[in-house]
């Protein structure tokens, strides 16, 4: 009888030890889900990217006259890895989300420089795609609407390229950007991909882009 009791105790201890890692994995998954909220710098499910989510990101920036919330949905079948952000005007306190798997969307923001300065929020995001090429996203929210308008663009560059002044000029001046006109625009990007995006026309802007298989 005593041997049976000992065997029972040993088996119970083994089962308990086996259950602990599983619980830890579940806890980590729950933490990841909690991190996937509507804040700049987060990665969320692609299907969850909506105007309401971007408005939440925008609101978190506070009372700033020139600001933007950016959401880019990855339905490309590829994984994206952040390279950098180049700001032509303005800034952001957010680190560009590092990894964006297929089926997920990144959230980011930008704003005018702090203080009484006449600047907008203008920049380019660059992501290395798992096929070896670079996805680039332009956003432009100007300070002076007497002379300028909102503009955006999304393009794929061959090979690996970091965002810089030259990339900004290509996207803004030469590669047919879209005006932020409160409407949706579509474009074939090449490499078997296409895009669909929306940007509003105001100084507190949202930019929603979906990159999908063509």
Swiss-Prot record:
A single BP term in Gene Ontology: monoatomic cation transport
Region forming the signal peptide: 1-19
GO molecular function: channel activity; toxin activity
Pfam families: Anemone_cytotox
Record site: Interacts with the lipid membrane: 179, 195
Key word Signal present: yes
A cellular component annotation (GO) from this entry: extracellular region
Record's keyword terms, sorted: Cleavage on pair of basic residues, Cytolysis, Ion transport, Membrane, Nematocyst, Secreted, Signal, Target cell membrane, Target membrane, Toxin, Transmembrane, Transport
Motif stretch (Cell attachment site, crucial for protein stability): 179-181
Segments of this protein annotated with the region N-terminal region: 46-65
Domain observations: Composed of a long N-terminal alpha-helix and a core region rich in beta-sheet structures. Before the pore formation, the alpha-helix binds the lipid membrane, partitions into the lipid-water interface and stabilizes the monomeric molecule on the membrane. Finally, it traverses the bilayer, thus forming the transmembrane pore.
Known partners and oligomeric status: Octamer or nonamer in membranes. Monomer in the soluble state.
Family (UniProt): Belongs to the actinoporin family. Sea anemone subfamily.
PANTHER family: BRYOPORIN
Name of the protein in question: DELTA-actitoxin-Aeq1c
Organism: Actinia equina
